[in-house]
Amino acid sequence: MFFKLVLVSAVAIQALSMSILKSNVKRDQKQLQPCQENQICHEVPNSKYEAPPLVHCLCTGGKRCPMDTSLAHKTTGSGDTLMYLFRCI
């Protein structure tokens, strides 16, 4: 009986945590607006895949946000960290 109670509790906790995770993902997606003209869609600090890109907006109208750093605009951020800035193409 005790084991059944523990099992049911564990399943309930897992279901609750999954629903919280899903709602957080949905909330993050809702906050992203379509990109305006020439707006940065995402930026990548330092090297291509060293850190996850900071996504700013969603490309629309059949355009995409490239991951090719040769298409990116480079700028130095704080402490001379190289930033690759991507725009919709």
Swiss-Prot record:
Major location category of this protein: secreted
Subcellular location: Secreted
Superkingdom of source: Eukaryota
Keyword ATP-binding applies: no
Annotated source species: Scolopendra morsitans
Keyword Cytoplasm carried by entry: no
Protein name, as recorded: U-scoloptoxin(11)-Sm4a
Post-translational modification summary for this protein: Contains 3 disulfide bonds.
Signal peptide interval: 1-17
A GO-annotated cellular component: extracellular region
Family according to the record: Belongs to the scoloptoxin-11 family.
Keywords: Disulfide bond, Secreted, Signal, Toxin
Tissue localization of expression: Expressed by the venom gland.
GO molecular function, one term: toxin activity
